[in-house]
Amino acid sequence: LTVEPGKKLSMQKHQYRAEFWIVSEGVASLNRFGKEGVTVLQPHHQNTIYPGQWHQLINQTDEPVRIVEIQYGHKCDEEDIIRRVD
């Protein structure tokens, strides 16, 4: 998973899958809507997003952020994405 400089992913959640992330390069901000606020993810940091948890990756730096993402759970496909409209 790559987030280019100055870009962000949509605020989203999944009903059936979890995602395990390892930051391999760059620094990202993880926004967990309404619960834990924003967490800064540095290289080699690990994070788990659980089913039903709103989340958004933001790259506020001048360098790309690269994340190794492992999806696991009952259903791991692109249909299992619910996006929040801002």
Place the predicted regions along the sequence by residue.
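A short glycine-rich, His/Asp/Glu-containing loop-to-beta-strand
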Residues: 1-18, 70
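A structural signal for the main folded, soluble domain(s) of proteins
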Residues: 3-4, 27, 35, 56
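Structural motif
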Residues: 8, 20, 27-29, 54, ...
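Glycine- and acidic-residue-biased ligand/ion/polar-headgroup-sensing regions
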Residues: 14-36
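Short hydrophobic/aromatic patches on the structural cores and recognition surfaces of FHA
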Residues: 26-28, 44, 67
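Short acidic-glycine-tyrosine-enriched beta hairpin
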Residues: 32-55
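Double-stranded beta-helix
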Residues: 56-86
